[in-house]
Amino acid sequence: RGFTMAEFHAIPIPLGAAVVAATSAGFSFSPGRKFELLGVRMSGLTAITGHASNHCAFTVLGSDESTEIWDYSTDSDEDGTTTAKAILYTSDEEAPGGAGDTAKDFETAETKALRTYDANQSCIVKAAKGGSGVSIGDTGVTIIIRYL
């Protein structure tokens, strides 16, 4: 089943979670064992610049599964607090994209059911395309997985 954003952020980070640093060029991550993807958390989202919706993509590549993209978007509350929203899209549905999108596009979406991935599949995190000067910088990324 899918998760609400509150449920997603309440998931405890288990042993074996991979904590990595992202760059604008992206990075790949392959656990080498069959695993279940629970989610991806990012810190320092305000470091993402040059894009109207301030989002970056998390993609899981696999030969027998649709490409799935976690789209992390920032939104500012009335008091100036910046919050992160995480939405999972699959390749068979249209994911918002482009410099014209705003965080409001992501506000009511919820994650889809998560899948299990084989050891030969890898995860890639990189900055969203579009806009100028898009960069994640030294944003901290925590990939939350459970080995099977």
Where are the regions a protein language model picked out?
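Surface-exposed, low-hydrophobicity beta-strand/loop segments enriched in small/polar/acidic residues
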Residues: 2-148
